[in-house]
Amino acid sequence: MNFELTSAYKPTGDQPEAIAQLTEGVLEGVPAQTLLGVTGSGKTFTIANVIANINKPTLILSHNKTLAAQLYSEFKGFFPNNAVEYYVSYYDYYQPEAYLPSSDTYIEKDLAINDEIDKLRLAATSALLSGRKDVVVVSSVSCIYGMGNPSDFYNNVIEIERGRTINRNVFLRRLVDSLYMRNDIELNRGNFRVKGDTVDIYLAYSDNLLRVTFWGDEIDGIEEVDPVSGVTIAPFEAYKIYPANLFMTTKEATLRAIHEIEDDLTKQVAYFESIGKEYEAKRLYERVTYDMEMIRELGHCSGIENYSRYFDGRAAGTRPYCLLDFFPDDFLIVIDESHVSVPQIRAMYGGDRARKINLVEYGFRLPAAMDNRPLKFEEFESMAKQVIYVSATPADYELVQSEGIVVEQVIRPTGLLDPVIEVRPSLNQIDDLMEEIQIRIEKEERVLVTTLTKRMAEELTEYLLNNNVRCNYIHSDVDTLERVKIMDDLRQGVYDVLIGVNLLREGLDLPEVSLVAILDADKEGFLRSHRSLTQTAGRAARNVNGMVIMYADKITDSMRLTIDETNRRREKQLAYNEEHGITPQQIKKARNLSVFGNGAETEDTQKGTRAYVEPSSPNIAADPVVQYMSKAQLEKSMERTRKLMQEAAKKLEFIEAAQYRDELLKMEDLMKEKWPG
C-alpha cells in the first residue's frame, strides 16, 4: 500500500520547492540532506509531503517524548489510512541499577512499565515486520536502545488461514511459544481463552480480540471482535498473529545461554581472585548463580537484559539489536530539531557505559552487561543510510554530513517576517532601552531583555521598577514554579518586560513579544555565539512588529553572521509577500491550546488559500496513552510531569517547563472529567 496524504492544506511559500528538492534527493540516493526551516514555516507538513512522494518506511526521531507525541498526532492526521506508529520508552518510572564506590551504595533497579506504551511499541514492530511500506514510526532516542532479535520475533509470528488444517492444541502451544498466556477467567492484553472450538486472543499490539473458531482440526472462521461488546468488527480470510513480547527466545537458546554464562562466570571469578578481589568474586558468583537458577526454573530473572548478548548469540563487543533492525534496508530517517537530537544520540552510549563500569568492576555484573547498551554514535551512523536533518539552526555536524545540500524553508504561511535587527552603541543603552520599552507599552506589546549575568538582570529589573515599568527577571536562583508563572504572567500582561540571562532558548513561543534587546551583544561567548544570537533574535519573529536591538561597541563575527542571515531571510520573505499580495498576520495564540488541536489554520485574505502552520507547542492529549490511563496511573503521570517541569525550569529550559505545565493542566482537567469529585 502507498502513502495517502490527507490534508485540507496546500503547500505554500517555499514549501513546494523544499518538498521537490528533498524528494529528488531521497529518490537519487543522497545519504544526508538538511531542511533549514524557520519557526512556523510548516516543516512537519513539508516532511509529510516528502514521505508521501518517496513511499518508503520512515523513522521520525525526536529528542523527547512530549515532542514525539505531538509529531505522532500530526502525522496520524496526515496519514489516517496508513500505519503511523509511536515508539518511546515504556517506563512510567525507571531507576537504573548502579553502584557508588565512594559511599559503598548499591542502588537496585526499580521500574514501572506503562502497558499502553508497550502495546504501541509492539504495534510499531509488528507493522514494520508485516512487509508493508506505508509505515511511519515516530520515536524518541529509545530507538537506539537494545531489544530482541527481529529474526526471533518474526520466526514466532503465527500465520493462520481459513480452511487450513491445524490441530487446536498445536495452535495453543504456538500461542504460548509467542508468549501469550492462557486465562479463561479474565482476558487482558497478551492473554487468550478457550471455550470449546473458539479461541479468543487479546492481541498484545491491538485494542481488539482475535476470534479463531475451529471445526475439528480445520480453521472455520477468523474475525476481529470488540473485547467489551463482543460485536464482530471485521472478518478475515488470513491473519498474522505477532508475538506478545519484543524479547523472544527458544528453549535451545536459553540452555546455550546458561552454559555460556556459567563459563564466563568461572573466568571472571578466577580473574577477580587472581587480583585479590575475593569479596567481588564471591559477590559475582552468588548473584549470577542465583540468576541462573531463576532462569532455569521460571524462564526469567531480575536484570535478565544484562545477559541479552548470550540469548541473542552475539559476540562480545558487538552492537545490540534495536528498532532500526526492524526496518527494511531501504528506509528514511528524519531527525527533528537535529541540533539537539544528534548530540543526544551521541551522548547515550557514554552515559550508559559510565554507570555499568562500576557494576562490572565491583562484581555486581558480568562484563557481558556492557553489551546491553544503546548504539554507539558510529553504529547509528552506519545504519542511517538516508537522513534528513530538520532544524532552524543546524549544527556544523549536520552541514558537514549534508555536504552543502541544505534546503531552505524561510517563508511563513502567515506572511510574518524575520525581525529587523539594529545595532546601537552601549553608551546610554539603558536610557535608550527605556524609550523603546515605553513605545511597546503604549502598543500593549511585550519586551524581552537578555543580559550576561544574573546580577545585571536583577539590577536592571530594580532600575526599571523604580521607573514604574512592570517587569520581572528570571534566572536559576528564582524558584522553579515561580519561573514558569512569570513566563505566563508576561503573556497575560501582568508584566511588560522580562529580563533574563539564558531564557531565550529554542522554541520559546511568545507572540506578544515585539522587541528583543540584547545587552553587551559584542561580548563573545556561548551566550553571544552565532547560534545563540540567531535563536534569541527569533523570539521576536512571532510578532508582526518584531524587532531586535543589539547594544554593542563593535560588530563581532557572530553578530555579523546573525545580522546578514536575518536580513537575507527578510528580503526573501518580503519579496514573496509583495509578489503574492500577502499581508503579514499577527499570530493569536491562546493561553492554553485546545486539547484536540492538531495544528492551526491561517487564511490568506487576498488569495483565500489555506496553509498549514505548525502548532506552537505540544499538547498532552496528543499522547495516545493518556486517555487510557487508570486514575492511579494518571496521578502517577501527573506527579512525574510536575517533577519534569521543575527539572526543566531548574535547567533554564523554560519552554519545556511551560509545555510540561500545560500538560499538567490538561491532565488535571482530564482527571476532573473522568473522576469528578
UniProtKB/Swiss-Prot annotation:
PROSITE patterns the record matches: HELICASE_ATP_BIND_1, HELICASE_CTER, UVR
Intervals of motif Beta-hairpin: 90-113
Xref: InterPro entries: Helicase/UvrB_N, Helicase_ATP-bd, Helicase_C-like, P-loop_NTPase, UVR_dom, UVR_dom_sf, UvrB, UvrB_inter
Primary location recorded for the protein, binned into one broad class: cytoplasm
First and last residue of the signal peptide: none
Coiled-coil intervals, chain numbering: none
HAMAP family: UvrB (MF_00204)
The protein, known as: UvrABC system protein B
Gene that produces this protein: uvrB
